[in-house]
Amino acid sequence: MNAGRRQRAIFVEQFYFPEGWGGAELPRDITMYLARQGYDVEVICGADLYAPLEGDPGPDPRAAGVCIRRVPRLLGGDIHSLKLLRQLWFYMGLVPRLLCVRAADVYVAQTNPPLTVPIVAAVARLRRRPFVLIAMDVYPDVIVAHGVLAAESVVNRVLEATFRWAYRSARCVVSLGPVMSGRLVAKGVASDRIREVSNWATGATGVVRGPANRLREEWHLGTDFVLLYSGNLGIGHEFETLLQGFMAARRIAMGILLVIVGKGSRLEETRQRVQQLGLGSAVRFADLVPAERLPESMGVADLAVATLREGFEGLIVPSKVPGYLARGIPVLYVGPRSDIDHLIERYDCGYALRNGDVAGVTAAILDACGDRERLLARGRAGQAGYESELRRELGLARYETVIGEALESLRGKA
């Protein structure tokens, strides 16, 4: 950044510090990094927490110079109840905060909640400033894939036109991988405006294994082989194939456990399915842990799991996978062919199976249990790939480049 006037960046994301959800920790990393690079950074966010944490929430962005403006909380209780009303309230609070503060040199938004995208795009257009979109999801396609909207409905056509305009108006759109980039091009985003920046691991990236890991005792894991699912259990994640494959594997090798650490809209549904399948004694559920205990929660894993529902490929990319790779944990991915397949194939760091392939999932689990040396080698390969191409420092530098490119476009118009 030049030594003249500090460039002003406004970020919009509903969930921000202090927050346990990985999707909110990433913008915290980005905004703190930019503030330390000399940018004048302001974040407009909500007061609700998607995944509240007990204990230390990690570094406070305000200590790095980030200004935080919050839309006050409307409702208490479960964040997943009355979700649309909560989002509407956030939009109503967002608009005056965008219009009444000093104009930014660049506006940046993630895709949460969805209508943030066209709102921030419109304000950036009104202010004649560049707009940078971080596409954690692709809308309204995610809503259609979930079955909430019919593709041919009038509402979806209106939303499609609105989001298509917003995506195309962005000076830069950050994509999480090549499959998502293809979705964005299909939406009309020019390929030369797309920048691929993978998510990175949040929290402490070490692992604590063996008897030193207190969670093995707290969660009653003993010396069993552990599959770990860590993170959000949302609308885009599929669990039936995983649970069926896990159940079949346990019929052959009893010393296997599944640990699910996280929250999300499908958590209760997953709990119920575990009970229906008679897997209650083999599956452990736990809340998200504070950042300082991530080395322990990740350290229980012999094999880490990511899933994706059919139709969600390229619409979302599970951010838990870079977290697994950073810690040297091999990955079992169950879902349609997606950006996760690209990572697993590139680094030879695990298994990629399709939804419905119960036999394949069973075989992968048994293979992982039966050849620990090969499994450890895959974990090391994934970690080496992460350090070489995906680590936090590289991602932050790429985001700074994206912001710089957007600002160059502004200077070009001057």
Predicted regions and their residues:
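N-terminal subdomain of nucleotide-sugar transferases
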Residues: 1-64, 249, 411-414
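Donor nucleotide-sugar binding/catalytic pocket of nucleotide-sugar-dependent glycosyltransferases
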Residues: 45, 152-211, 221-222, 283-286
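A short helix/loop element that forms part of the nucleotide-sugar donor recognition site in Leloir-type
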Residues: 55-61, 206-220
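Conserved donor-binding/catalytic core segment of Leloir-type glycosyltransferases
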Residues: 220-237, 242-246
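Nucleotide-sugar-dependent
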Residues: 237, 290-299, 304-325, 330-342
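Nucleotide-activated donor-binding/catalytic signature segment of Leloir-type glycosyltransferases, i.e.
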Residues: 261-262, 267-295
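A charged, aromatic-enriched C-terminal amphipathic alpha-helix characteristic of glycosyltransferases
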Residues: 356, 360, 370-403
